[in-house]
Amino acid sequence: MTNIRKSHPLLKIINDSLIDLPAPSNISSWWNFGSLLGICLGIQILTGLFLAMHYTSDTATAFQSVTHICRDVNYGWILRYLHANGASMFFICLFLHVGRGLYYGSYIFMETWNVGILLLFAVMATAFMGYVLPWGQMSFWGATVITNLLSAIPYIGTSLVEWIWGGFSVDKATLTRFFAFHFLLPFIIAALVMVHLLFLHETGSNNPTGIPSDMDMIPFHPYYTIKDMLGALAMILALLALVLFSPDLLGDPDNYIPANPLNTPPHIKPEWYFLFAYAILRSIPNKLGGVLALVLSILILILMPLLHTSKQRSMMFRPLSQCLFWLLVADLLTLTWIGGQPVEHPFIIIGQLASILYFSLILILMPFVSIMENHLLKW
């Protein structure tokens, strides 16, 4: 008699995805981030659901409702801070997951990679709209500045911005629709995750060497379920430490001031995970040019499979490419720092140089060095 997990229509899907799935025997802890992202999404949906039960998406009461959650709702404060810092954890895992994909050549699985980029955009959109909901100063002005960027689009720009706002400024209509979309998008993300996994399981996982591992596979359970549980434990521990010891470490103090359209904060900046893109946006003096650079800074990931000129898939045995990869990481950290600084000397020129280096590394230097390595190895 066949085991029920192998014959039952529903259990069979779970079995083929989480239990009997053949996985390479040599995948390292860098492969843990997929499951960690799944846990992050689960935490965000759960905490968000309970927060939505007490939140009101009205400009007159939104700020007060968040205060009410923190002060009067049982364990409301921990829900709110788990949700806010859970987003930061989500992005840490996302960046590491994408970085892993770049380093080990996972982008060769083009369908999985492209769905992943779509997921990245969806998560960024969700996080941006979520930041607007507490209706603090930075929420209001962040929403105003970022949505206003669309006015740089020729001909339809102004109409598009007013259509998104639902009026002539960020107001009640904007907050209500942002709340609606912020609630809806995580479920769309969950559906996209299923598609992402579907494409991944068509090809099987990559591994650190970049060499096909068909001849050396092990079952996902118990080996990688245990490994994922250890990663999850570490991440949840880090998240709880952040929430319970310094919940406002990654937030902006200006967001504890209720939104005031008549008073602009001295430095308008987004959450830390958008700062690298914000720095690229600010480094170009032209508005449309800046918006294009902002979009391309993420969209450039789509070109990765086309820019792969090496005969080897992974960077594991390519020291020159490794140097450029870590230079790219350092460059992104520099951009993140610059994004949080005021627009003045010397930050302007540092931001411009870091932006030029970012695009040069991905479009020119890394493909060129890969060709050079092929010649050095006489391939």
Swiss-Prot record:
InterPro entries: Cyt_b/b6_C (IPR005798), Cyt_b/b6_C_sf (IPR036150), Cyt_b/b6_N (IPR005797), Cytb/b6-like_sf (IPR027387), Cytochrome_b (IPR030689), Cytochrome_b_C_euk/bac (IPR048260), Cytochrome_b_N_euk/bac (IPR048259), Di-haem_cyt_TM (IPR016174)
Membrane-spanning ranges: 33-53, 77-98, 113-133, 178-198, 226-246, 288-308, 320-340, 347-367
Cofactor notes: Binds 2 heme b groups non-covalently.
Protein's cellular compartments: Mitochondrion inner membrane
UniProt keyword list: Electron transport, Heme, Iron, Membrane, Metal-binding, Mitochondrion, Mitochondrion inner membrane, Respiratory chain, Transmembrane, Transmembrane helix, Transport, Ubiquinone
Primary localisation category: mitochondrion
Keyword Transmembrane helix appears in the UniProt entry: yes
Database matches in CDD domains: cytochrome_b_C (cd00290), Cytochrome_b_N (cd00284)
SUPFAM superfamilies: a domain/subunit of cytochrome bc1 complex (Ubiquinol-cytochrome c reductase), Transmembrane di-heme cytochromes
Cofactor list: heme b
Positions contributing to heme b b562 binding: 83, 182
GO terms (BP aspect): mitochondrial electron transport, ubiquinol to cytochrome c
Binding site for a ubiquinone: 201
Other observations noted: Heme 1 (or BL or b562) is low-potential and absorbs at about 562 nm, and heme 2 (or BH or b566) is high-potential and absorbs at about 566 nm.
Biological role stated in the UniProt entry: Component of the ubiquinol-cytochrome c reductase complex (complex III or cytochrome b-c1 complex) that is part of the mitochondrial respiratory chain. The b-c1 complex mediates electron transfer from ubiquinol to cytochrome c. Contributes to the generation of a proton gradient across the mitochondrial membrane that is then used for ATP synthesis.
Family named by the database record: Belongs to the cytochrome b family.
Assembly and binders: The cytochrome bc1 complex contains 11 subunits: 3 respiratory subunits (MT-CYB, CYC1 and UQCRFS1), 2 core proteins (UQCRC1 and UQCRC2) and 6 low-molecular weight proteins (UQCRH/QCR6, UQCRB/QCR7, UQCRQ/QCR8, UQCR10/QCR9, UQCR11/QCR10 and a cleavage product of UQCRFS1). This cytochrome bc1 complex then forms a dimer.
Protein name as it appears in the record: Cytochrome b
Species name: Epomophorus wahlbergi
Encoding gene (name): MT-CYB
